[in-house]
C-alpha cells in the first residue's frame, strides 16, 4: 500500500454516517472514509451476523470489541478477540466473517 497526497486529518467515527449491509443472517453497519485508493471503515456486525459472500479483497482488520470468527474457504477457522488482527492480500485466501454476539472492527483496504 502506497499512501501519497494525504494531508494530516482526524476522523471522529461517531460523526460518520453508517450504511447497513444485510448478511445471510444479521447485518453489518459500515462507517466509511475513502482516502484516494485507501478505504478505511469502522464496522459493527450485529449478533448472529454471517457474511453473505466469500470475500476475495485484501484487508488489514483489527477487532476493537466482541469476537469475530473468520472462516477460510479451505475450512480453517480463526477466532479473533479484542486487540487481535489479521491481514490478507487481494485474491489470496477467500474468507468470510461471522459473530455470535456482535463485534466492532476497524478495517483498512
State what each model feature region is.
Residues 1-42:
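A short, N-terminal "cap"/entry segment at the start of jelly-roll beta-barrel domains
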Residues 28-30, 40, 58, 67, ...:
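Short, acidic/polar N-cap/turn motifs at the starts of alpha helices
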Residues 39, 69, 104-106:
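General beta-strand recognition
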Residues 53-56, 60-82:
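A short beta-strand-loop-beta hairpin characteristic of the jelly-roll/cupin
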Residues 77, 81-84, 89-109:
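Ligand-binding loop in jelly-roll beta-barrel domains
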Amino acid at each position: 500500500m502506497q499512501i501519497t497526497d494525504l494531508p494530516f486529518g482526524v476522523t471522529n467515527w461517531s460523526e460518520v454516517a453508517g450504511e447497513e449491509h444485510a448478511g445471510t443472517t444479521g447485518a453489518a453497519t459500515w462507517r466509511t472514509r475513502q482516502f484516494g485508493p485507501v478505504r478505511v471503515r469502522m464496522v459493527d456486525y450485529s449478533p448472529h451476523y454471517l457474511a453473505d459472500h466469500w470475500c476475495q479483497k485484501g484487508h488489514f482488520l483489527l477487532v476493537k470489541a466482541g469476537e469475530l470468527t473468520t472462516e477460510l474457504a479451505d475450512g480453517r477457522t480463526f477466532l479473533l478477540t479484542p486487540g487481535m488482527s489479521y491481514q490478507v492480500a487481494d485474491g489470496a485466501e477467500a474468507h468470510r466473517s461471522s459473530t455470535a454476539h456482535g463485534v466492532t472492527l476497524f478495517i483498512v483496504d
